[in-house]
Amino acid sequence: FAELFGPGSRAEVPLTGRIGDQIVSGQLDRILVKENEVWVIDFKTNRPPPRIEAQVPEVYVRQMAIYRTALSQIYPGRRVRCVLLWTVEARLMEISEELLEAAAP
């Protein structure tokens, strides 16, 4: 967790972009921009949290897919990694590229 919450990361970052003919906007709970990749972390409070990726609510996967698409336009050439932080357990769960691609706008 240290790097995701360290001095190089930012909290509560507004995001606006265009995906196709749609304007999308949101607020990133946490973002870490590195040389070759971008991490976006969204805090979730589900009780109990999902144990496996297949149990993650579809609306969360779609939200992260939208963030990923918008951030890919802002940071071309960098891998965008989407992570959910289940706050009740302080547990990170990265959403797979396959699942994000399937939910992409």
Predicted segments, located by residue:
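Structural signature of nuclease core domains in nucleic-acid processing machines
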Residues: 1-105
